[in-house]
Every structure is written in C-alpha cells, then in structure tokens.
A protein has these predicted regions:
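Cation-handling catalytic/transport regions enriched in His/Asp/Glu
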Residues: 1-264
C-alpha cells in the first residue's frame, strides 16, 4: 500500500495535478461533484447517521445479551439466528424469475433472457474465485452475474443487487459508444441498491417466516454501512493529501477516523 500511494502520487504529479485526489476522482468518473461536496456529505453522515447507528448497535448488544459488542459480533443480529433463504439455488432462481415477471414486463423479459442463456454462475465450487459481481460481455450484448451462494441472505441479495446492475446494463446494451453502457461508478449503485428495495414485497417467498428479520437486517445493514463507507473515503483523502506519511502515521490516522465514524 505504501508503494501504491507513492506510485499514484508520481502519476498525478507527472500529469500536472497537485496530488492523486483529483486524478483519482477522474479515474472513478466523479464528474459532477468534487472533494468539497464529498466532505459535506461526510459531515452529514457524521451528524445524522452515526448517532442512529450508535442506537442500532446499542439495541443489538441488548438484544443479544452481551456486556460488550465486539467487532466479530456485529454481523450476528438475532439470538435465533440471522435470516437465510429457505430454498435451494435452483428454486431461488425460479422464484426470482416469477418475482421479476410480476414486478414489470421489462424486468421479466430481462430475467428470462438471463436464465434462458445461462448468464448466472451462482454455485460455490472448489477453486472458484470468491465474491460476486455483474459484468457485461460486449460481443454478446449480455450481462453476466457471478456469485458464490452460501445459504445466507447474501444469496437473495445477489438476485436483487447484482440483478439491478444487470438490468441496467441490459437496458443500455444498445448504447454506443460502448463506454457509455455503464454509468459512472457511484451511479451504478443507484440501480443495484434500488432493486434491493423494490423487491421487498416478494421477499416472503424467499425467507418465509423469517421475512421480517430479513427486512430489519437488510435495512439496518444499509444504514450501518454509510459511516464505514465515508470512513474509507475520508482515510483515502488523508493518505493522498499527505503521501509522505509513514505506515505508523497512516495507522494512527485510520484509528482516529475510526473512532469518529464508528465510535461504538
């Protein structure tokens, strides 16, 4: 990481920038807002979201009956267990198809396209790369979803979040030039995160009696992510504004910001 910061700083200076921040914004396709706008957003999260998150974590600690809520406890929401889909991968895909057909004719057409052409690689397999994502295959004008189902709520979120990305790029597949098929990076998340919420009325068919646990887990998880997201962003601004910082100074900077955004 130390070497990466210095390489990026040299790149930026060679191109005439004061530091890597402005170049980084361009590389991330942040064209409509600047670091001042992002700083203002961080302040709003600090003022409005961090107190709410502190309350959510306090309620979680009480709900679990712990004296202290440790970092490794944070993903454990209910003493009865976190919500998980009740069905196999094959059945979940069938239910997702029905869901998208009922949501709108266009989303139904899209998901039929995905399933008929086997454009979802969802099973966990030995040697398979970790993670999940949606990409686009230009020669076939097709989205492709890659994931590793593991019988947790993330399986359902693949069929909503990544499908949100896939529906957007499916709808944009005829746009030319090809660079405009995807929007900017942050704008991409509008489609994926929105889809997660659009399909709430159908989640009972995935989680059955645990659906309310899923709603709580999903919504509170989205709120809890905001301070962490801006923490990472703030840290990167500090690092690239002061590339001469030592590793120890960067660690101290991270810890200082962590206490600010994640005080629980």
């Amino acid at each position: 990481y130390y070497q990466l910061v210095h390489v990026r700083t040299r790149m930026a200076k060679k191109l005439g920038y004061e530091n890597y921040i402005e170049l980084g914004y361009y590389r991330m396709m942040r064209f409509d807002y600047n670091k001042n706008d992002v700083e203002n957003y961080r302040k709003q999260v600090l003022e409005d979201v961090v107190p709410l998150d502190n309350e959510l974590y306090a309620r979680q600690q009480k709900r679990l009956g712990y004296d202290t809520l440790h970092a490794w406890d944070e993903k454990f929401e209910f003493t009865s267990g976190n919500p998980a889909p009740k069905y196999s991968r094959e059945e979940l895909v069938k239910r997702a198809l029905k869901m998208y057909q009922e949501l709108d004719p266009k989303t139904g057409e899209f998901f039929e396209f995905m399933t008929e052409r086997e454009l979802l690689d969802l099973d966990s397999k030995p040697g398979k790369a970790a993670g999940g994502y949606c990409t686009f295959i230009p020669n076939y004008q097709s989205p492709f979803i890659f994931a590793n189902f593991n019988q947790t709520s993330h399986d359902a979120e693949v069929l909503t979040h990544e499908a949100g990305h896939a529906f957007q790029v499916y709808s944009s597949k005829d746009i030319f030039p090809i660079d405009c098929v995807w929007p900017t990076y942050e704008s991409c998340e509008i489609h994926s995160m929105s889809m997660e919420f659009f399909i709430y009325p159908w989640m009972k068919s995935f989680f059955e009696e645990d659906v309310n646990k899923y709603y709580f887990n999903h919504l509170s998880g989205a709120v809890k992510f905001l301070p962490y997201g801006v923490l990472v962003d703030h840290f990167q601004h500090e690092v690239y504004e002061k590339p001469e910082m030592s590793c120890e100074e960067r660690l101290a900077t991270w810890r200082k910001l962590e206490k600010q955004y994640l005080p629980h």
